[in-house]
Curated annotation (Swiss-Prot):
The gene is acyP. It catalyses: an acyl phosphate + H2O = a carboxylate + phosphate + H(+). Residues 4-90 form the Acylphosphatase-like domain. The active site is at residues 19, 37. It comes from the Bacteria. This is Acylphosphatase. GO terms for molecular function: acylphosphatase activity. InterPro entries: Acylphosphatase, Acylphosphatase-like_dom, Acylphosphatase-like_dom_sf.
């Protein structure tokens, strides 16, 4: 089933390649959306795609980022809208 999730990632997550790593993983999983640095030092990710693929992306964010220190990942699941054609970094 297709879903959309809004993530807010906190910790030492800017300037360490997190957005690019998320971009690579999301693209490999067929997920669309974006990753963006926020002014408070966190990273926002919006991901659309297969629910299981999104769960795999979230697991990767929590455990697979070598240079980042992820303290928390807030998840807000939303109805799938198909707003994005690809995955982008802002």
């Amino acid at each position: 089933m297709k879903k959309t999730v809004h993530l807010r990632i906190t910790g030492h997550v800017q300037g360490v390649g997190l957005r690019y790593s998320v971009y690579q993983k999301a693209t490999s999983l067929g997920i669309t959306g974006y990753a963006e640095n926020l002014y408070d030092g966190s990273v926002e990710v919006v991901a659309e795609g297969d629910e299981e693929s999104i769960k795999e992306l979230i697991h990767f964010i929590k455990t697979g980022l070598r240079w980042a220190r992820v303290d928390n990942v807030e998840e807000r699941w939303l109805e799938y809208k198909g707003q994005y054609k690809d995955f982008r970094i802002y």
